[in-house]
């Protein structure tokens, strides 16, 4: 093989990689715009565990923002997080389409279960956080509030929107990644 043929093969691989990355990026941007349109609904969904815990507690709570741009930036963050969460299977499929032509048939068959299980396990980790961990964690942390004694001030939660949603998104991401452990270990 001549040097020019090697360079041609290398350039074609880079071109294919570029095409796959551009498809992934365009898909992510499209879903980001869609998610931004529905950002308030997504925000409501992510805040629901907090709202339910507060309602069960019987206290009058709210989420606050302390900077003028905080709500806007929170909607941007929520939209990007949701778009990334939704497009992850598509991005993995693009990576697969780039890698698959270089694999033998038996290698493709061996990897296929992992490709299917990866997004499923990530989604299950996110569901565990949303439906089980967050409600329990919120109730646990709210139990540390105090009414104050005659000599001390009460400790009361004034949760910031951005901090709460950052916690929820970090936990969803962390549990989604930790649910990948069976794939990594096998």
For every predicted segment, state its role.
Residues 1-186:
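Membrane topogenic/interface segments and analogous intrinsically disordered interaction regions
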